[in-house]
């Protein structure tokens, strides 16, 4: 097989496995049998192993020597550290680049998506607006290092946020947050962002104890 074809297969397998982890088709803490996954995906052993090794570097898979691969498990510490890091980064960016965020056309586009979620209650629309809003704060900094660091932890954020079932409530909090930004209420927006993220933390931890593991 040519190198370009090998790379395409590896990328496809990586994306498939990543999606299976994030939507919890592969359960938190589940042991991953490479040969079974190879058969399920109809692909050879090597691309699956390579994809799992890549996912391990991103924190979605854990490698235990002489034992095998496991989906990263999530506990209270994992959730608290993830949210704490988000608060540090997102609040800093909202506070220091408030005017740039408030004047962004994308903010109005996101507000439109939030209105759509209110009408349809569709999780997929919420997930898109959620990612766009929080990444908007980070990108507004224009700081390539901050943006890069946030992207590196996004898979961890994604794993946590898919445990949160309160998306209709989160959507309302997003709407209130955007309204405060648009109105120029900087301090109110900062407090709302902190409150929102702490609410996500509390609800995710609560859901953790009802999550059905493998």
Predicted feature locations:
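C-terminal effector-binding regulatory domain of bacterial HTH transcription factors
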Residues: 3, 190-214
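Short linear motifs at protein or domain termini
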Residues: 1-96, 209-214
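Conserved amphipathic alpha-helical segments that form helical-bundle/coiled-coil interaction surfaces
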Residues: 102-166, 172-179, 188-199
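Juxtamembrane/interface motifs at transmembrane-helix termini
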Residues: 49-50, 100-103, 167-171, 207-214
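Short, flexible helix/strand-to-coil boundary loops that buttress conserved ligand/catalytic motifs
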Residues: 75, 83, 150, 161, ...
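A short secondary-structure junction motif
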Residues: 20, 24, 153-160, 203, ...
């Amino acid at each position: 097989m040519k190198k370009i074809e090998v790379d395409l297969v590896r990328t496809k397998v990586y994306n498939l496995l990543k999606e299976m982890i994030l939507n919890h088709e592969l359960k938190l803490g589940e042991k991953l049998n490479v040969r079974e996954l190879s058969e399920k995906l109809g692909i050879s052993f090597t691309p699956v192993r390579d994809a799992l090794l890549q996912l391990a570097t991103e924190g979605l898979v854990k490698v235990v020597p002489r034992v095998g691969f496991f989906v990263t498990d999530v506990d209270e510490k994992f959730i608290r550290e993830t949210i704490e890091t988000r608060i540090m980064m997102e609040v800093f960016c909202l506070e220091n680049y408030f005017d740039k965020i408030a004047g962004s056309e994308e903010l109005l586009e996101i507000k439109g998506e939030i209105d759509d979620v209110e009408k349809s209650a569709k999780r997929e629309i919420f997930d898109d607006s959620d990612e766009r809003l929080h990444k908007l704060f980070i990108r507004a900094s224009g700081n390539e290092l901050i943006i890069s660091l946030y992207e590196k932890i996004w898979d961890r954020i994604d794993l946590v946020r898919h445990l949160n079932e309160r998306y209709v409530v989160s959507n309302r909090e997003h709407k209130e947050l955007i309204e405060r930004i648009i109105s120029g209420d900087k301090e109110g927006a900062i407090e709302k962002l902190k409150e929102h993220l702490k609410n996500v933390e509390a609800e995710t931890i609560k859901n953790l104890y009802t999550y059905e593991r493998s």
